[in-house]
Amino acid sequence: MIKIAVLGYGIVGSGVVHVLDKNAERIYKNAGQRVDVKYILDIRDFPDCPYNSLFAKDFETIVSDPEVTVVVEVIGGADAALTYTRRCLEAGKSVVTSNKELVAEHGSELLKLAMEKGVNYLFEASVGGGIPVIRPLAQCMTANTISEIYGILNGTTNYILTDMERNGAEFSAALFEAQNKGYAESDPTADIEGHDTCRKICILSSLAFGHHIYPRSVPTEGITGVTINDMRYAAALGYKIKLLGRSRAVGEKVSVYVAPHLVNKHSILAEVDDVMNGVVIRGNAVGNVVFCGAGAGKLPTASAVVADVIDAVKHLYARKWISWTDGSEDLIADPVLLASAWYIRTDASCEKVEKEFGSVLFADDTGSETAFVTSVMNGKMVSELLNRGIKAYSQFRILGDH
């Protein structure tokens, strides 16, 4: 029997304990050993919890117990979680986490420490919730050279954009609705400003390209600038608006950014609506591989965490090879130099737009505004043309017909 500890009994932590309990026989069959929760660490009291006897308030009890071989860290944040993770790895315990902030900021350090101690640091649930994307990228696609990753990585923003598109809701109303349904936090900043998506694309990019991509190096734009008019014009032009995290190999460097994009309404990602997530990974042998599913939620995320627990149990004496080196600003390419078509909304006349941009595709029925799609050009060129007297109210890349 394998003894484990769960650090944190919030939404994900309680889901993990629930899945381990309710699916115990299935987990035993897949892991080859019984998996027993010995401790749940939380400073709060849960007097009515059926697992009340398992609670501990002192981390030292857990880290010093030689019976505990796998620790699940679902505290969140990068403060106490970092300290606890380091201590557990140093003590020779494998760690499983859903903590995207911790992996995005400290992944290279923690993977190196796990390697030195001969244990595992696993984080399938840190990206995509219940969607299996880390393991396929790290194992099933290792014969490929990855050239690009892009996707809808945040369910909150995708729900808001879907509500705006379908129901004509203003951004503020769509956000309020998302909060009422529990899809958005009371402070939604990390979601709507793109920080959550940034952390996730950093993790995927670090794994795919082999060196740590730090969130601070990634230009990040959220969805607060997307308007109802943008939604209407995009639809008229044959597109939907989605917030994407995107990374692309540029020679020996990697270009990574987060921003709203117009995606072709007939593309796969255009069909990923509401709180669903979708990720596309392009390999030079396999082509495009698409992963879609529930990107958040108690049980979908717990499902991914428990899958990693099973993996850790099966590899107690054989380390899984998941690693990347530390990163450097020298390895990051500026996305402003990436070429694409662009959607622009302005109050400039069609004549002025055509004078500066040449042949463009205009949206119909835009009233006093002008909305158009440019030919393919990089962001630097777009800025130069706009500086000739065209004020852009919105400026989004076109993903293309992927």
Predicted regions located by residue number:
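N-terminal glycine-/serine-/threonine-rich beta1-alpha1-beta2 phosphate-ribose binding loop
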Residues: 1-90
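Conserved active-site and cofactor/substrate-binding residues in soluble primary-metabolism enzymes
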Residues: 7, 11, 15, 35, ...
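Rossmann-like NAD(P)H-binding beta-loop-alpha module
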Residues: 68, 115-196, 203
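Rossmann-fold NAD(P)-binding glycine/threonine-rich loop
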Residues: 81-87, 91, 98-138
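Substrate-binding/catalytic subdomain of NAD(P)-dependent oxidoreductase enzymes
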Residues: 175-271, 276-278
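A conserved regulatory-domain signal marking ACT and ACT-like small-molecule sensing domains
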Residues: 309-402
